[in-house]
Design a protein with these regions (language model features):
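C-terminal ends and interior cores of transmembrane alpha-helices
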Residues: 83-100, 293-306
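Helix-loop junctions on the cytosolic side of multi-pass membrane transporters
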Residues: 99, 126, 130, 172-202, ...
């Protein structure tokens, strides 16, 4: 890359590196709070509610958050949201240090922090568009995927180690320190060009503008709906995986960590691949094909295998292409959506593409506990089912993996017939 391009990417590298550290700190706190709450309650439902509280504002309020992003200064929006979220974390630390921290405190604080993230995220997306040259979109998408991958690998390892060594307070302190670095980087070193404020519409009208754009751009909307189905299946998979690995004679909680880490490593490799791969001839096709490969291989391998090595291989195959898909989708969105509309359109995308995640988590758990496991228990003497899925607890989860594999394959093939009429090539 030449010096001119490097100079243009200076602001991005500062923003990316400092925000990545802040994301790692936040993820560590979330993981440590899960450990702390489970120790206090012994309830999986209470810890799951932490995620629900932080995720609900993201799904419900995203459309309006995007409208606010397009109305206000991007840097100020990010700084205010990050600061308020950090204050929430500080409140948790104070309550913890004074032995006053209660479960409902965490739920309320998580909901407010989730709301701040809902507003901050589209502002951050638009900022990336404004400070990055158009021909570098694929590269920065790969780096953003790399961040998400590294955070998913590192945060449970670092948080659990620090939590065991010195407690919840030290994890929160690291999080607050990472916030300070991110705040200084954004406030003092990042120059974000602001778009002229031409519109004087209400926030509701601005939100409707995002929906109108999606209605007029069927390629973008079709991709979003396609990926909402992918997220439904992937989140059901996430709910099924622990029930598949932990009861297995060769599994257990430690093996679940290894298998999960294999997915994170695969995403790191995929993110590196994105940064060096050439521009594809048709990015829409890449989005479709990568998901067909991911959903059409991983679940089948897991359904019919009993060896941890094969589980890890399945995770690698299933996740290594996810950053490739994300990068190509990101380039399509950044180049297709006008900058002055990106905040509200990204927010609409967040609502439509991600609302299926909590639904998938719920359905996956219900299917395993109430359908698949009881079915396998009542057919434990069936030689065919035992040969295919094993026996005992966990065999129902293996059956669920097959169901998810079939559902994922059918979803990709059905939507493939829709997506084939759309093509996107960089100009």
């Amino acid at each position: 890359m030449n010096n001119s391009t490097n100079n243009k990417l200076r602001d991005f590298y500062i923003l990316w590196s400092t925000q990545s550290l802040s994301q790692l700190g936040s993820a560590m706190t979330a993981f440590a709070l899960t450990l702390w709450l489970y120790e206090k309650t012994g309830s999986a439902l209470s810890t799951a509610a932490l995620t629900i509280c932080s995720y609900a504002p993201y799904v419900i309020m995203s459309i309006f958050a995007g409208a606010l992003t397009d109305r206000f200064n991007k840097k100020a929006t990010m700084l205010v949201c990050d600061t308020l979220a950090a204050l929430c974390t500080l409140i948790v630390l104070i309550l913890y240090k004074t032995d006053s921290l209660m479960m409902w405190h965490l739920y309320a604080i998580n909901a407010f922090s989730g709301l701040m993230n809902t507003v901050q995220q589209p502002a951050s997306e638009v900022t990336m568009t404004l400070i990055v040259p158009k021909d570098s979109y694929q590269k920065i998408s790969g780096l953003n995927s790399l961040t998400r991958s590294l955070v998913s690998v590192l945060n449970p390892l670092l948080a659990s180690a620090l939590y065991a060594f010195s407690g919840l307070g030290s994890v929160i302190a690291v999080d607050l320190g990472s916030f300070v670095l991110a705040f200084i980087g954004l406030a003092g070193f990042i120059r974000i060009p602001e778009q002229p404020k031409e519109v004087k519409e209400s926030t509701l009208e601005l939100a409707k503008g995002g929906l109108r754009f999606l209605k007029k751009t069927p390629m973008v909307f079709s991709l979003i709906i396609f990926l909402s189905g992918v997220n439904l299946i992937a989140s059901a998979f996430n709910a099924t995986l622990p029930a598949y690995v932990i009861p297995n004679p060769k599994g257990g909680s430690n093996m679940l960590g290894i298998v999960t880490s294999a997915a994170g490593v695969a995403m790191v490799l995929g993110s590196i691949l994105v940064t060096v791969m050439p521009k594809p001839k048709d990015r829409v096709k890449v989005v479709f094909v990568t998901m067909l490969i991911s959903l059409g291989t991983e679940n089948y391998i897991l359904a019919f295998s009993r060896e941890p090595v094969l589980w890890c291989i399945a995770e690698i195959i299933g996740w290594i292409l996810v950053p490739v898909m994300s990068a190509n989708l990101d380039v399509i969105l950044r180049n297709t959506i006008p900058v002055d509309l990106q905040g509200r359109v990204y927010a609409c995308r967040n609502t439509f593409q991600f609302f299926t995640i909590p639904i998938g988590l719920f359905l996956g758990g219900v299917m395993v506990d109430n359908v698949c496991e009881p079915f396998m228990a009542t057919h434990e003497y069936s030689e065919l089912l035992t040969m295919l899925f094993g026996s005992g607890k966990g065999s129902g989860a293996a059956l669920m993996m097959l169901i998810l594999g079939v559902a994922g394959t059918l979803h990709c093939l059905v939507f493939g017939s829709i997506l084939r009429k759309y093509h996107y090539k960089d100009t």
